[in-house]
Amino acid sequence: MDKKTIIEQTEKYYLPVFGRYQMVMELGQGCRVWDNEGNEYVDAFAGIAVNSLGYNHPVLVKAISEQAGKLMHCSNLYYTEIQAKALRVVAEATGMDRIFFANCGAEGNEGAMKLARKYGVSKAPTKYKIISADESFHGRTFDTLAATGHDYYHVGYGPLSPGHVLVPYGDIKALEAQMDDDVCAVLLEPIQGEGGVHVPSDEYLQQVRALCDKHDALLIFDEVQTGVARTGKWFAYMHSGVKPDILTFAKGIGGGFPVAGFAVPERLAHVFKPGDHGGTFGGNPLACAAVYATLTTIKSEGLVDKVAEKGEYFKNELRKLQEKYPDKVTDVRGCGLMLGMEVAGEGKPIVESCLANNVIVNCTAGNVIRIVPPLIISKEEIDIVVAALDKALAAC
């Protein structure tokens, strides 16, 4: 099909829930993608921080292809070798003991909150309150929607799930004012992504940990976007040393294949009993092959340390743009290869300018250019992205 036909057919049948660019993607290799008209782009968005190893990484392609030829799906009523292998590497990467596999970040967060609710109610029937942060994003299922701190996502659905409280991100006094013994969990992103790439202080996270301990509330870190070496550590909580009670993951853990879940320490392993939670597709052999290949490749290629190094280089280059355009760039922040460049005006024209110059970036929170490239991006490709941003800023 040609571009026009593909777009028309998609628009005819797909629910109109996405604001799409008029592009048809066809091929990816490394950090580059091509549309069906042959145009090549440097991708600094990675499918929203998903394609950890870039496109068509040979180890990942081989693992998925070989597993597809053996066993694509198997009920969790039975054991598989590839799931056992995937569980071990996820436990090692997260620093946790027990894993539950799901299919998307919202599912992982939903399961984490469900476990926290059961934990709380087992202590007291009124211990079910969950506190999360303004400007957060945790998913679009009904409970994750209630935990998400954006009014935009709440409008038009009537009453949201009860028992959720929102407080300003980074404000320990606001959190303390809401904390009591009826709180079963505090759910936070260790770095806010959708809210504008906001990095909290270590002190704030340490104080949150202390409040949770004081009130016997579980600390849940949503690492859907920050996890899997994205910030220059296996998981972002490792920067502060503040370990959560529940850690959720998704996006980059499958290298492009849909996988998600949550991880807990041994002391929470038996909050759920058989039948309390589950899922038909979570932890299927194909997904587990992707997880195992992705995590072992990140380790063997030393990508955690490389991300920290390249992220510092990238951030410094963005700061040079801030110095060059002080009236247009108001802040540069982030960690590793999760970076945000805040601009004085709307961010959308900058994204569109970059796209016209064959570079893919994203705008979040209205005026923050979000940069979350594949972990394998080279310095030469970083320079291409920075040059496109420079050109966009000069023109706006």
Task: Give each language-model segment a name.
Residues M1-C396:
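Conserved N-terminal phosphate-binding loop of PLP-dependent enzymes in the Aspartate aminotransferase
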